[in-house]
Swiss-Prot record:
The lineage of its organism: Bacteria, Pseudomonadati, Pseudomonadota, Gammaproteobacteria, Legionellales. InterPro entries: Pyrophosphatase, Pyrophosphatase_sf. Transmembrane segments: none annotated. It catalyses: diphosphate + H2O = 2 phosphate + H(+). This is Inorganic pyrophosphatase. The keyword Ribosomal protein does not apply. Mg(2+) 1 binds at D66, D71, D103. Pfam families: Pyrophosphatase (PF00719). Its EC number is 3.6.1.1. GO terms for biological process: phosphate-containing compound metabolic process. Its cofactor is Mg(2+). It is found in: Cytoplasm. Disulfide bonds: none annotated. PROSITE patterns: PPASE (PS00387). It comes from Legionella pneumophila. The gene is ppa.
Length: 178
């Protein structure tokens, strides 16, 4: 099965599929799945000596305001491989803008079926504060050395806002697809 055939999830927006592009703590390489072919491409080598604090991917069949699928940060006990699909639920969203416009990041945990470790985490406020600060720090600085690029981190919002973003992005995708 092609990555292009993966649905957004079983119980959207409560449970979504996330296709992992970048494993947590991986090398400073920005990978992106080509949405037409499903192939994993090197997007760029990051110029800052930083690593992603969580797994990083996207929800298929979505379109965020920046023209890309909705970005998702997935908290797991170990790094996931690029191209893996994981069933998640949103616990919050980091509101951000960058040189391309609105660039929110959904914060998600694996569904209870995959791991009971995260069932008590219902909102971003249940996530260890140090991890939230690490995520914010990463996104505030990961483009620092890239000319013409910038990021403004605007803060965390809860799971309701994250689910609204997921629903809006699916509607946007379906509207464009027609």
């Amino acid at each position: 099965m092609s990555l292009m055939e993966i649905p957004s999830g079983r119980d959207v927006p409560n449970e979504v599929n996330v296709i992992i592009e970048i494993p947590m703590h991986g090398e400073p390489v920005k990978y992106e799945v080509d949405k037409k072919t499903g192939a994993l491409f090197v997007d760029r080598f990051m110029t800052t000596a930083m690593f992603y604090p969580t797994n990083y991917g996207y929800i298929p069949n979505t379109l965020s305001e920046d023209g890309d699928p909705v970005d998702v940060l997935v908290i797991t006990p170990v790094p996931l491989i690029s191209g893996a699909v994981i069933s998640c639920r949103a616990v919050g969203m980091l509101k951000m803008t960058d040189e391309s416009g609105v660039d929110a990041k959904i914060l998600a945990v694996p569904t209870t079926k995959l791991s009971k470790m995260y069932q008590s985490m219902q909102t971003y406020q249940d996530i260890p504060q140090h991890l939230l600060l690490s995520i914010e720090h990463f996104f505030k600085h990961y483009k620092d050395l890239e000319e013409g690029k910038w990021v403004k981190v605007e803060g965390w919002v809860g799971p309701d806002a994250a689910r609204e973003e997921i629903t809006s992005s699916i509607n946007r995708y379906n509207h464009i697809k027609k």
